[in-house]
Amino acid sequence: VKESLDHLTHGEIEITGRLVDASNATLFGLMHHEGSAMEVIYKPIAGERPLWDFPDGTLADREYAAFLFSDQTGFDLVPPTILREGPAGLGMVQRWIDVDEEVELGKYFSQDRAELRSLALFDAIINNTDRKIGHLLPDQNGHLFACDHGVTFHSEDKLRTVLWQW
């Protein structure tokens, strides 16, 4: 985590694409630092769509808060994430996770797995209003990561999900 955070903090962002299915501006890129490159997601605050139930311009902060909470409590579910300036202004930058393409998502997420129970608890604590199967990222080392935490930490109970069918 420390090495990834150093890379995210001190690297130079090169935007190489955009995730077109995202509701907010979500840019894919490379973070160049000390001769190496790391794939990243960059979500500039300027690209956030207003939501009726969340204050404008706070989604990136909530993404960062989810990482800090996950990291500091040992959940280890959220990829390394920081807030920093980028080509489109201040935003959230997160290490990209390569998903294990061999994992059959429907089968994986219908099983009673310790990491899914941990994620369900994590979502309840951070009051996640938007957990979907596409936000879960099982990597090639068997570790489960989760992304897209912009609508969390609301002051009202808003836990919503379409994932926890089991």
Task: Indicate residue ranges for each PLM-predicted region.
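C-lobe/activation-segment region of protein kinase-like
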Residues: 144-166
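Conserved ATP-binding subdomain of kinase catalytic cores across diverse folds
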Residues: 3-108, 112-129, 133-134, 140-147, ...
